A protein has these predicted regions:
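DUTPase catalytic domain/fold
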Residues: 1-168
Length: 168
C-alpha cells in the first residue's frame, strides 16, 4: 500500500438496522460494532449477537480482530470471543459474547458490543530445526521473572491481589 493509498474497510449490510463500525474519537484504534436486535446474554453463558454485517472488502495486507470494549467487561463482566477476521473472510460478523456474571444481561438494540482493531498482515517462514537456539531466558516460564520477595506464600493467596476489584 503506497503512502497515498487510503486504507479501506467496506461492509455488506445484511440487516436493515446494521450500522457501520465507527470510532468514537479520531485517536481511537477500535471501530465499535453494534447489535441489531435486543439480546439476552444468559448468566454464566454465552450467545452470538448479530451485527448485520459481512466484510465486503478490506485493503490487501490487512486483517482485523474482534476485541473487547472495556466498559462491558468492567461494568457487566461481558467479554467477546476474540476472533481473527482474515482479509478474505466473507461470512457473517456476529460476535459471541460470554457472560461471566451469574445474572442474565439484556443488551438493547444498538448497544456497542465489541470493536474491530486493524492489524498489518505479517507472515514468516515456518520450518523445523534440530535444536533450539540458545537464549538468555532459556526454558524459564510461568512467573519466573516475578520478584520472590514480593510474595510470602505462607501469608497470602495469589488471588489476594485481586480483592480490590468488585465483581459486577
Amino acid at each position: 500500500m503506497s503512502s497515498k493509498e487510503q486504507l479501506s474497510m467496506k461492509f455488506v449490510k445484511t440487516h436493515e438496522d446494521a450500522k457501520l463500525p465507527e470510532r468514537a474519537h479520531d485517536s481511537d484504534s477500535g471501530y465499535d460494532l453494534y447489535s441489531v436486535s435486543e439480546v439476552i446474554v444468559p448468566g454464566d453463558g454465552s450467545v452470538v449477537v448479530p451485527v448485520g454485517l459481512t466484510l465486503g472488502y478490506l485493503t490487501p495486507g490487512w486483517w482485523f480482530r474482534v476485541e473487547p470494549r472495556s466498559g462491558l467487561g468492567f461494568k457487566h463482566n461481558l467479554q467477546p470471543h476474540l476472533g481473527i477476521i482474515d482479509n478474505g473472510y466473507r461470512g457473517d460478523l456476529g460476535v459471541k459474547l460470554y457472560n461471566f456474571s451469574n445474572v442474565n444481561i439484556t443488551l438493547n438494540k444498538g448497544t456497542k458490543i465489541a470493536q474491530l482493531v486493524l492489524y498489518p498482515h505479517i507472515t514468516a517462514e515456518v520450518s523445523f530445526i534440530d535444536e533450539a537456539v540458545e537464549a538468555d531466558r532459556g526454558d524459564a516460564g510461568f512467573g519466573s521473572t516475578d520478584y520472590k520477595s514480593d510474595m510470602d506464600t505462607d501469608k497470602m493467596s495469589i488471588y489476594d491481589n485481586f480483592k480490590e476489584y468488585p465483581s459486577a
